[in-house]
Amino acid sequence: MLQIPVAKVAVLAATFAFDRPYTYKIPQPLTDTLRPGCRVMVPFSRGNRPCEGMVLALDQAQDDPKLKPIMRQLDPEPILSPELIRLAIWMHDRFFCTIYDALHAILPAGVWYRVSTVYCAAPELDADAALTLCGRSKQRRLALETVLAHGGRCPLETLQTAFGDNDPASALHWLVEQKLLTVEGAEKRVVRDKQLEYASLAVSLEEAQEEIRRRRRAPHQVAILELLCTIGRASADEVCQFTGAPKTSMKTLVRQKLVHIDTEPYFRRPTHYTGQPKPIPALTAAQAEVFSGLQALLRSPDAQAALLFGVTGSGKTLVYLHLIEQALAAGQGAILLVPEISLTPQMIEAFSAYFGDAVAVLHSGLPLSERYDEWKRIRAGLARVVVGTRSAVFAPMENLGLLIIDEEQEDTYKSESTPRYHARDVAKFRCAQHRALLLLGSATPDVVSRYYAETGRYHYFTLPDRFNARKLPGVIIADMKQELRNGNSGSISSVLYAELEENLRRGEQSILFLNRRGASKLVTCAECGATYSCPNCSVSLTYHQGNQMLVCHHCGYRQRVDDRCPVCGGELRFFGDGTERIEADVHALFPGVETLRMDADAIAMAGTHEALLQRFARERIPIMIGTQMITKGLNFENVTLVGVLNADQSLYVGDYRANERTFSLITQVVGRSGRGDAPGRAVIQTFTPANETIRQAARQDYDAFYRSEIALRQLNGTPPFSEVLAVTVSGAQENAVVRCCAYIRDYFRQTVGERAEVLGPAPLPVVRMNNRYRYRVTLYCSQSKAVRRAAANIVMYCNTEKSFRDVTVFADDNPLD
């Protein structure tokens, strides 16, 4: 049989149940240019609708009339390296997503096309005969008439509008099969490449000077020629700006072939470092010892993984800088991940000071154009150091030598939307591909990571002391039950009040932490007990004092707060303090004292995290009040007091990680204190002062916490002694959701019951969100291909089975909630 060239293509329109590499013929004109990593337009499904695809591999196959040909090539060069193609396929298998879901995570939004489907009248179509052929079918006639009414070329969106609530797909499919219509695809890039135009003389210097003498009546043209005679080549816009000449004068000179215009790529960038890179500060003896061990791993010919435990303020970042310097010297690239966008400006400023323009930044807060151009700089090898949040793990770095995850225990490294990946898992895969060093750093490592270090899966390094022998903050535990007995029902304990007063007297700054924005979590009637709840979600509305609004932080629903209870007219009471209420309490306790609030609402008004942080440092605002975004990575030398206002908030929830999250949160926020020359203090407010986790966090004793927590997890069989796999079902009808969940539970018990503990159906903590009920089946199991295969099979079955058409089903590794 005749062998022909074919391409294995991942198709955008393929759902998870039907996702696989599809085989397409490669037309003769594309055989020399098409390569893996290029996007193409292909006909897909019964209607041969034009659809975007990604070429995963090239092959030879027997000629088959059923094979469809590729319509056209979209990228002249591959936009994906072979390593990133392998990563996308691995993510498809690992995270229960389509290959294109993985590609959308790997590539920046600016690289994608907006593809529209256009239906065209067949060449030399006899309209009357075609309408007769449609017979009595109103839908076929409507589709054909709509295309003809638009000049024989009509976008699918226009046809859908003409059909109203009806679907035109069946009618269009019939018209295409009868060869009355053809289908085309039109694509438009989301972000275009930016080019700068440069002007230079297109003639000799002598000829240009002769033209200057001839053109005394065209002063703008003369000015342009004189400037180019002097400087040779410059930006066309700058030449016009400097000379005051209009662009028409430049165009005239170009048309007369006196001036030549050429273009160069221009990178839109979030930051530009203009100074000379400075030397990296020397390491202390303790840091040098850690660096020496990590440097040996960096130079290893095999992939390596290490955990660096360092108390807050121990100088982990300085170790990172020296390791990156070594990687660059060896011709390798480095990626540093940080958990919050708010930390990125500080890291960029610090790293750019040492590595200059070799640093690129990637995070979701950048404009599409800047993120796309930073991606291009990395891909072109112009940036060899990448700093960013979770998505920066996909940076197209060639010859990756070092990948660092700072504060590796943070939940923000886990994606909660498809694909539901953890950056740490992706980092492990990429480091294995590049034979690179994966370095996890934290003052409160993930319990699983610490266990892996203890059992030899990771190398383990420690920095147990603060930089320059600075002391850890002294911590006081404030018993809020005793405060109530003493008549203090406010949010600020007497102990914290005294410490704040002392800090104000000294002219030092303080940070107050509460992980709840808004003014009050619950608004209820003192007479009848009625509460304000979200009509779309099973949660109460949070009161925001600034605009007198009640807001749902899940779906965004909002309404005005009433003066009195809308049910009985009784007095409204406000419970569950948020950052806005704390700010009001501080102003009442310390009249005239300036405060700065750092939460999502304040940032929305200020514009950026960076603006608020710079203002806090520059103006030395006495008190900052903030949510979780202030707990890590921030370094203000004048902050000597931290107050944790509700240490119990994350402790008593139904999650095996509650102790770990509470310990980490308290330890991290307490670590913001005393990072300068003055000693730091911290006050932890709690209703359970005897709780062991809170006491361990107050002592900053991670080892003691780890020992007690790992013993508890071994007893309960939770990670690292098992893997957690969850299958979640959501839908508008609760009965349908529970029925599907029960079916999934029974399926797992029959297929993998011996390998896994199967629990559920159980509602999620917020059971109804955006008018969709959410239930889950959870498996505690050893990591096995059989369990994962069973999960993939049941997800595919439920999403295609007609009896479950009213629900959506997805699987998730180690879910956060």
Where do the language-model regions lie?
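Inter-lobe coupling/hinge segments of SF2-like helicase ATPases
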Residues: 275-284, 288-295, 301-738, 754, ...
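A short, contiguous, amphipathic alpha-helix enriched in charged residues
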Residues: 35-36, 736-749
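Surface-exposed amphipathic alpha-helical segments in non-transmembrane regions
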Residues: 702-704, 710, 745-750, 784, ...
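Short beta-strand elements
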Residues: 182, 596, 752-764, 805-813
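Short secondary-structure junctions
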Residues: 15, 590-593, 748-757, 801-806
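Accessory, non-ATPase domains that flank or precede helicase/AAA+ motor cores in DNA-metabolism machines
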Residues: 1-442, 454-470, 780, 788-792, ...
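C-terminal structured "cap/appendage" subdomains that terminate the fold
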Residues: 747-784, 790-794
